UniProtKB/Swiss-Prot annotation:
Keywords: Ribonucleoprotein, Ribosomal protein, RNA-binding, rRNA-binding, tRNA-binding. It comes from Shewanella baltica (strain OS155 / ATCC BAA-1091). This is Large ribosomal subunit protein uL16. GO terms for molecular function: rRNA binding; structural constituent of ribosome; tRNA binding. Belongs to the universal ribosomal protein uL16 family. It comes from the Bacteria. CDD domains: Ribosomal_L16_L10e (cd01433). One of its GO terms (cellular component) is cytosolic large ribosomal subunit. Gene3D superfamilies: Ribosomal protein L10e/L16 (3.90.1170.10).
């Protein structure tokens, strides 16, 4: 699963997920899966969607993952009193703003790409849409 190799600080503030995204254009592949809503994707969700797409395209074509979970989420164990410091890191997330391209694909037909992205979108907690590369 995806997570940073090393970080300057182990734990992070909660923060807010406002604003618009960077990385809104399809830049590596021909087709892309773009976020319409905002939220956060866990490393498990990113990997689950990637596996669904890879299985559907049957090892032809190429897939790029354009998001990386770089924010640690902590939680305290069950039935522990409040206080005594922040909990341990449980999992990693990537904060998503509307317009962010999550995955890209190349080397397959548009029909197969649409089906693969539909399978991936079912694994994700945010609303997404299918986009193609615009050639100027």
């Amino acid at each position: 699963m995806l997570q940073p190799k090393r970080m300057k600080f182990r734990k992070m503030f909660k923060g807010r997920n406002r604003g618009l995204a960077n990385g809104t254009e399809v830049s590596f592949g021909t087709f892309g899966l773009k976020a319409v809503g905002r939220g956060r994707l866990t490393a498990r969700q990113i990997e689950s969607a990637r596996r669904a797409m890879t299985r559907h395209i049957k090892r032809q074509g190429q897939i790029w993952i354009r998001v990386f979970p770089d924010k640690p989420i902590t939680s305290k164990p069950l039935e522990v009193r409040m206080g005594k410091g922040k909990g341990n890191v449980e999992y990693w997330v990537c904060q998503i703003q509307p317009g962010k391209v999550l995955y890209e694909m190349n080397g397959v037909s548009e029909v197969i790409a649409r089906e693969a992205f539909a399978l991936a979108a079912a694994k994700l907690p945010i609303k997404t849409t299918f986009v193609t590369k615009t050639v100027m």
